[in-house]
Swiss-Prot record:
Phenotype when the gene is knocked out: Reduced food intake in adults and larvae, reduced locomotor activity, delayed development with mutants taking 200 hours to develop from egg to pupa compared to 130 hours for wild-type flies, reduced levels of the insulin-like peptides Ilp2 and Ilp3, and reduced wing size. Reduced levels of insulin-like peptide Ilp5 and reduced body weight of mid-third instar larvae.
Official protein name in the record: Neuropeptide CCHamide-2
The species this protein was found in: Drosophila melanogaster
Signal peptide: 1-24
GO cellular component, one term: extracellular space
Chaperone listed as a keyword: no
Region (Disordered): 42-78
Induction: Repressed in larvae by starvation for 18 hours with levels recovering when larvae are refed with yeast or glucose.
Entry-linked InterPro entries: CCHa1/2
Cysteine disulfide partners in this protein: C28-C35
Organism superkingdom: Eukaryota
Keyword Signal set for record: yes
Places the protein is found: Secreted
């Protein structure tokens, strides 16, 4: 009985590992982006025909001199063109939205703190309330 259960577990584990390996071999092509090394490498030349084939006009320009937006087949996430490189991360000053947010946060944190104007009307007693109210 124990040998049958252990044999069944080994078979199940083998099937699961084989399924994972078959999914892993799809590589980057399953996600529609360029792989650098390994299997599933997309060719950088548009005429080779070994790409994933998102559209027939990958190298063609759209109307208005702009290249078309490259979208995954499911339409959820944009992907890069075959000859496009990852844009470099810009400097902090290149992001005006960050600058605006930084200025707002800085003004909030650098705002002078004023003491409560009505210390005598507080709902709770202070430890040194006599000193704060000027009573000796």
């Amino acid at each position: 009985m124990k040998s049958t259960i252990s044999l069944l577990l080994v078979v199940i584990c083998t099937v699961v590992l084989a399924a994972q390996q078959s999914q892993a071999k799809k590589g980057c092509q399953a996600y529609g982006h360029v792989c650098y090394g390994g299997h599933g490498k997309r060719s950088l030349s548009p005429g080779s025909g070994s790409g994933t084939g998102v559209g027939g006009g990958m190298g063609e320009a759209a109307s208005g001199g702009q290249e078309p937006d490259y979208v995954r087949p499911n339409g959820l996430l944009p992907m890069m063109a075959p000859n496009e490189q990852v844009p470099l991360e810009g400097d902090f000053n290149d992001y005006p939205a960050r600058q605006v947010l930084y200025k707002i946060m800085k003004s909030w944190f650098n705002r002078p703190r004023r003491p409560a104007s009505r210390l005598g009307e507080l709902d709770y007693p202070l430890a040194n309330s006599a000193e704060l109210n000027g009573v000796n």
